[in-house]
Amino acid sequence: MTSSDSSVNTTSSSFGNISISSPNHSSSTPPLNNGNGNNVSASETELKKHVLYSLQCLDEKTLTLKVKLDHLNKLVELKKSIPDLNKLGISPTQLYKSVRPFIALPPKTIRTAGLRVMRYYLSNSNNVKELLDLKVQYFITRSLERDKHSEPERIQALKIIRTIMEIDCSLMPHCFVKGLVSIAENQEDNFCRVCLECLTEISIRNPQISSHCGGIRTVFDAVLDPFYQGIQESLLICILYLLSDKDTRIYIRPKSDLEIILAPLTNSFNIGVKLKGASKEKEKEKEKEDEVAMKKWTASSKAVLTLIKSWIGIISLNSDDQGLKSVVDTLRMPQIELQEKALDSIFEIFRVQLPKSIQETFGPQKATQTFNFGSETLQDLPSRTRSLRHNLLNNYLSVLLIAFIDNGLIEGLVYLGNYVANRDGMSEQEKECSKNISLKSTVLLAELLHMSNALLPPSQCAKLQTLPSLVNSAISFRLDPRLRSSSNTMVTNLHSYSHNKSSTTLMDSTLAIGLTGANKWRRIKGQDRRLDKVDDVKMKMEWHMDDNQFQQKIKDTQVLVTKDYQKWSWELMFELLEGPLNNPQHLSNTLKTKFIKRILSFLRPNKKLFSTMAWTTENLKYVRTACVALEVLISHEIGFDFLKDNKTIIQIADMLKVELDYNIKPPPSSSSSSENKKDNVRLLNPEKVLKTMSREYFTMLGTLSSNLLGLEILARNNIFDYIKPLAELPGRDDLSHLIMTSLDYNVNGASRTILQKILTSSSRVVRYLATKYLRFLLRSGVQDFSNWGVELLVQQLNDVDAKVSALSLNVLDEACDDPSCLEVLIDLKPNLLKLGKPGKSLLLRFLSSPKGLENLLQNNGFVEQEEQLWITSENATYVNAIESAVSESLSPSVWRFKEAPDGSSTSGVYLPPHFFGELAKTEKGCQLIRKSNNYQRFLKIIQDPTAKQLDKRASLIAIGHIGSSVDGYSFVKESDTIKLLIGIAEKSQCLALRSTCFYALGMISCIEEAQPIFNSFGWESPSDLNSRILLPKDLKNSTFLSVPQYQYQGSWADHSFETLPSNHFSDPIKNEIISFVGNLSSHITAEGASKNLKRLKIKYPDHFATSEILNAVFILLNTFKYRLGARRFIYDLFDVAIFSSDPYHDLN
């Protein structure tokens, strides 16, 4: 209760988008409330006296309305001190009877106050029943349906309806819902939005009454209305809730209700079509129609996208003959604009991003292509081990694929790819647009083929990959030559895109080296076998290159001809360093020339050539060649001897020393001139590090640190003695980051020591970035990470900054996918429980190791307590969390790569550790599960028809986790669980339960022993069982994506209502009045009926003033559907009866 409710006339109050204000009012009786809003203590006796006195005053006929208004406001104040009227010995019915007359009086201020009192004294179901037994609902509905001049009254009426809805929606009267429907359908009314929202909530709480009153149909209609664009998603959530379970699904008309949403998608053939010979007025009218139709088409498209982002939506749309097929058929619309919008929607559905340039997508790839991996790219290196975890989004995408393919998506994309060839008479602009659409459809088709290869079983993949319709049109000479040519082009583009996609992937999960030094500039092997072969053959040929050829190539570089580096052929230099110079003989001969000397001379800091260049993409070719040259030299003893005392290395060491000396002993502030001179000497001051190539000297040092000979050179020149303090300099985060990301950590030594120092830097930012870099090192497969990296991560758990600690915990969680890292972590015994729920989640990983389980069993009953916790609550919390994560990740805003505060990727939904799943990974853990009989408990729950859906879903996930390990699968095999789960997935009346069961089946499908059983039931998995995906072999013969047939029970005509016989009254005039009131419900007869009713009221005013006829009118309003204007007209006709001395007489 807010202060604005304390008096009918106090200050301003608001509801939704509606704000009201009333004049001030002073109460004649002091309220039981002080100025600070704190209740003044009063005994129950005094409270009872106050209440009874106010009720007595309300019943007193001689008192003025102003006095009675004061007592109505006083009752509101008194309620703040009265938790329950019955405790005072006062019946709520007594109060409602005293207040009831005031909501049927002409002054709206009095009506508003009466409504407020009623609302305040509604606290339980009994109160609601007592109130409704007094038939006040008709007058509350009238107050709700008043015009804009009665907003305070309408707000109080709406609040009463919401209060009843929240207390017990099963008691909701029909007249309330009818009133809400009439307002929600009238967009000119200020309350239409809030009434629609109430209607949506009632549809969830009490779908039966909403359906009988037309509320659910109103919700469906509003989905496509541009006026309700802001709440469209809420409306669709309501619809999905109703579709989910058999008990609520019966209130939605099979197929026809969903087709309200789908209709605009395929009924828009006339949009944009110009009328020949039409007048300007007709053209303007057509433009307006097209605008409205386009808005509905867009709303329909968005609605379908929202539906498809849920399992309930996919199953419901696939069950409807026109569901997903309507979405696919939009690709065949004649309007190019609609084709493109439809294509973009399908890109969004499958979470596929369009390339920045469609045209360049199909360009040829060069075998000699090289790539630049900056430090930012390195941070986003994909996980080497994450692919082993179950990504729930892959299950979702696999079902989307088979459902859309079954509904003709591939044929639709092929049609779009050949669209230009199928049309004559197109303008140049249309042809250009169509060509773009054709290329986009080819990209999407290629992406789907690529996706299906990973997510679909081989049998389904084979049918898809052959593309029979496209291939047939490409090779058939009976078809139009243009179509054949277009099909050939599409086939070529598909091949090109598929090839380019694999060859341009910079990194993959098989990467086994840290990308430092020269490795930053090489194409990663294993991405493209064709390019790998080309490189191997080329390297062998260059290795065995004869001396004459080699000497000629050396000359062609121009290095021996001129000292001007701009005239050198840097590409040829790079090729020589990568190839022939790896041959010791060629290297030995070259070192006798000035080739290597001039390259290293160019790199000397003091030369001010390389060191002062701008740090640009174009200039990175120099550091690329420099790193490869250093790598070649430290790979051979002769190169080592040449490099160990080279001036370039000495000058790099001096450069580091200058920077270190400056920061340790900065010049006095008075000597500004000397400071400027020293600043010019410094190549590593912040500005130069940011803007010049001097920063790349650290990359070269990283190359040297990757090899024992290189490390010896660094030690010989005391470079590590300079790097260590530079990495810890306060205020030089740039140097810390450069040093950290440049050094090589594959060799145990000073590099790892420096990284450890950086991890304990005084700068929070540096510590965070260093911890994040440990994730990169883990993913890149750096040598012996488990032996040193895990310990560093455990050290970071104690960081004072919560973000650093959370990040290290997240990286440790990922590291534990590697058994060796998990074993090291178990030995370190970190205190993970102090880190809250994420820490406990990581601790659960210990259960999957015999050693870890043994440790936890000795930890003061941790396992037993956790087991009990998971049985009572955590199982349910877990399933809610993962399903919410799936729902959230399907939101468009997170379809692109994002990083969470803990540094983790949100590009997938990976299953977190589950207590029973981790326990089942060891033999001892399985013994504990068997001893506690928990598996049998889960089986009983999923078979119990009276069990809650949440408990069933939680049990399904627990079964899936237990059955996903080799040891745990024994439980599945013993109890014939697979048959039970497939039965639920295919036949459950609860669609949400099917989706959870689908996930559980996917978990178990990673066990090879289970595959024959799945095959016997008509289900199969992709070749890679680690994908944890299980799909029906034939979707048409499976009921997995089909809603069971049901009988619609939402029609009001099929249910008994309070109705009137045709001759209800003995007086024919009254019967005629009632007949015309009934005709107002039809827009066909409404105009004539309203004229006749006006005529009859003038002629027989007394017939409109009795409570008897008012009762009959309320029955009609409660039975039939009237528009808001008609309802207000009816209330005005019978206002005398409504405001009579006893309007409740015949209602009672």
Curated annotation (Swiss-Prot):
Protein name: Protein pianissimo A
SUBUNIT field: Part of a complex, TORC2, consisting of tor, lst8, piaA and ripA. Additional proteins, such as 14-3-3 and heat-shock proteins, may also belong to the TORC2 complex.
Signal peptide extent: none
Low complexity bias locations: 1-34
Family from the record: Belongs to the RICTOR family.
Taxonomic placement: Eukaryota, Amoebozoa, Evosea, Eumycetozoa, Dictyostelia
Chain spans, region Disordered: 1-41
InterPro entries assigned to the protein according to its UniProt record, in alphabetical order: ARM-type_fold, Pianissimo_fam, Pianissimo_N, Rictor_IV, RICTOR_M, RICTOR_V
Biological processes per GO annotation: aggregation involved in sorocarp development; chemotaxis; chemotaxis to cAMP; establishment of cell polarity; G protein-coupled chemorepellent receptor signaling pathway; mitotic cytokinesis; negative regulation of asexual reproduction; negative regulation of phagocytosis
Gene Ontology MF term list: adenylate cyclase activator activity; guanyl-nucleotide exchange factor activity
Membrane-spanning segments: none
Any Pfam family the entry gives: RICTOR_M
Keyword Plastid: no
Result after altering G917D: Temperature-sensitive phenotype and defective G protein-linked adenylyl cyclase activation
Native organism: Dictyostelium discoideum (Social amoeba)
Keywords from the UniProt entry: Cytoplasm, Developmental protein, Guanine-nucleotide releasing factor
